[in-house]
Amino acid sequence: MSSNLYLKRMASKLYFKITNKDECHHGFQYEDGLNILDNEFNDNPKDSCVPGRLYFTEIHHMHKYLEFGIYLREVYLPIDNPSFRMIRDSSGDKYGANMIVLGIKRDLRDKKTWEYLVSKGINLYENNALNWASKYGFLEIVKLIMENKINCYFGKAKKAYQLAITYGHTDVVDFLKTYVNTNSDYNFVLRGNDMVIYFKC
């Protein structure tokens, strides 16, 4: 496949990037529209998570990067720019480029953002998303995730349940307890703001 055909195929996909509150990562300030790397592009295929790349990912890997920030950005590739370069990261779950276009910004704390992500096919088989929402106490997002999880069988939400307890989100705890295996060797109980673990004899 020629490089032009490859780029056209890649550009036809929808990509995402998670940004923090200030949308500044490792000294690079992201803005709406075209963002161009301000130093030399790293095109070494063996490198991973290195300077010299503007990173982005596909929908089915996005759940791995939820801790990176609070905003979800749509990413487009400016393949018509003759200076555009990109590479698949050696980790296999993201890409790096010397320039990207940032589109719509959505708030990951908003349930509507998750309705959008579900419609686009976010990976809910892994529990990253559920654990994240439970840790930060986003009850409506937890409910939405559980409603759309195919593998939410009994006991699958154990880590999410423990995170909700640890961070004191009692409403999430109450919701998730029906999904947790109560026949385990220990029980978690909230006492005020403290977590108490009772081991069964």
Swiss-Prot record:
ANK-type repeats, residues: 125-154, 156-188
Keyword check for Repeat: yes
Domain of life: Viruses
SUPFAM superfamilies cross-referenced by the UniProt entry: Ankyrin repeat
Stored Pfam families: Ank_2
Keyword terms: ANK repeat, Repeat
InterPro entries xref list: Ankyrin_rpt, Ankyrin_rpt-contain_sf
Name the record gives this protein: Putative ankyrin repeat protein R868
